[in-house]
Amino acid sequence: VANEQKKEGEFGSRENLNKEDASAAEEAKAAAVPPWIEVSTDRTYLVKPTDVGHVLKLEIQPCDAKAPAPNERGVAETVVTSRVIPAPSPPKRNLVPIQKNDAVEPGSFTVMSYNVLADVYCTTEMYGYAPPWALSWYFRRQNILKELVQMDADILCLQEVQSDHFEDFFQGELAKYGYSSVYKKKTAQIFSEGKYVIDGCAIFFKKDKFALIKKYEVEFNKAALSLAESLVGSGGSKKEALNRLMKDNIALIVVLEALDSQQRQQTQQTGKRKLLCVANTHIHANTDHNDVKLWQVHTLLKGLEKIAASAEIPMVACGDFNSTPGSAAHGLLTRGMVDNNHPELQIDPLGILRPASKLSHPLPLVSAYSSALRRDNRLLESEALERLRDRVDPRTAEPMFTNCTKDFFGALDYLFYTEDTLCPVGLLELPGEKDARAKYGGLPNTQWSSDHVSLMAEFQWGPAAMNGY
């Protein structure tokens, strides 16, 4: 302003004075900006908490590796981000206590089931309503890990764990929190980003609470081959049967021994161990193949029957069953049978569901959520359960949803247990539809890093839990 008031003859034109003032202002502004700090030269960079509040600049300079002079480089290109914000955290969910049964044994354990959405399926084409950065595996894996660590379950049953991510992330990261693990991938692979990958099921367990006694792997494709051979003998086409039945789904089953100090003392006194059988599965998803879903569930149950025949062992069967309450598969699991008039039995192109009487099992399986919330076909009145009552379907007492996208809203995931040997004493709070659809309209989003939500239950041992398996 002072310079503008000077005469033009002394300091030049007013236009030049304005330019000089602007230049000085730019120099002062530049001097106030702190210098860039190099944080990485790797091809990928995972934002750190110390980056919050700062901007990041990516600088790429082309060079010719074959050039005689190594210093011959092209013009650098740069991209500057917005200021780094704190990473959204998964919403806090609490374990809701349920009235305890005086007849149960002391000691309890928690089991979580969670479809974590494999990266190979998490695309902008599928989930375009979410910001691309929220779909990035480098973000999602940290958010999922936060949730798993926060819940601190004794046993984790995860579905859609990508094979390479089990090896280079889940296995190592969860080992830091005291988990041992077993993994079974599906029986076909997908070529993605220059390598073959596929998802599968993983079971993690706290190694100070459980020890692995035995592992079983169920490949439904192997069972399909055997079934297809029998269908040929009855006039069916083997090729047709295999095309319909071979969907690459699997199940993973483990037998664990409880390691708490009280249990060790009981084992020494009685010679019997406290064991637990845990099954984790991901059933076929296509709604046009309900016969295949039902057959896969029945095949899994037959495998569990064989284990149960060797010892009276408590069981937890969980996972993504891709079956809604009221479906034939859900009915088989919870009622031990399928109604002969169930509409899903009418679509049976291979003739594998008849007679319906063969679709049965003797295992006393019930759903953790519905059994705890419902008695005599009505929801229980309980102050402790009030936080769950409005999040479950009043007709079935199952969660209103475990999967929420723009195209689907409903329950597909479950925690089943044998009611004669285990008793649920706590259930994880369920999110509401408003929570899941907030801002983006569905899952996944910036807070929820899968299209599924996790389920968790706390169990106490029933009086028949001791066995000599």
Language-model features: locations:
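Intrinsically disordered, low-complexity domain-flanking/linker segments in eukaryotic proteins
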Residues: A2-P35, E229-S237, D260-K272, P343-L359, ...
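Eukaryotic intrinsically disordered and solvent-exposed regulatory patches
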Residues: A30-V33, D42-V47, D64-P68, P91-K100, ...
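Metal-dependent phosphoester-hydrolase catalytic domains
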Residues: D164, K209, M246, A258-R264, ...
